[in-house]
Amino acid sequence: MSLTLILIRHAKSDWADPGQPDHARPLAPRGRRDAPRMGAWLARGGHLPELVLCSDAARTRETLALMQPEWPTTPEIRHAPALYAAPPRKLRGALEGMGARSIALVAHNPGIGQLAADLAAEAPAHPRFADYPTCAVTVLKFEAKDWSSISKGHVAAFAIPADL
């Protein structure tokens, strides 16, 4: 069975209020511009999730809220506190037991970028894949019976807002 994993780092966040808790930081104007563009890019490529697992931080929720209207279908959305600042192991663990064949994870660096690198059978030639900038998106394809049995996957697509 073919499984698709879409790894999305939140869009550029706002650092204007130094006293604001990290969890509550909203998107910066650039992030609010980039997120819909990346959502449209996913839709044009036919990379649409059935399920979205999203960190409950303000900037990940806002990124998803701006991407999702660009998609022709509405996925099930679950906001998960455990995905906030999660390491790759925890992000990957969130997939286990999920029945959806196409899942998007919306999370934070360094975890989301490390997970993309860990799961890619071959990293894309893109010069920004290694540092996984804000609003970077990787689409990985796996031939596996379920999420607990995925190993290395094929990178079907990778982009950052500057590419569009």
Annotate each predicted stretch with a short phrase.
Residues 5, 100-107:
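Generic beta-sheet signal
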Residues 17, 63-64, 89, 114-117:
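Short glycine-/acidic-enriched loop or helix-start segments at secondary-structure transitions
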Residues 82-99:
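Short phosphate-binding loop-to-helix
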Residues 123-154, 158:
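Domain-level recognition of soluble alpha/beta enzyme cores
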Residues 160-164:
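Short, cationic low-complexity segments
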Residues 45-47, 97-101:
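Glycine-rich phosphate-binding loop signature in dinucleotide/nucleotide-binding domains
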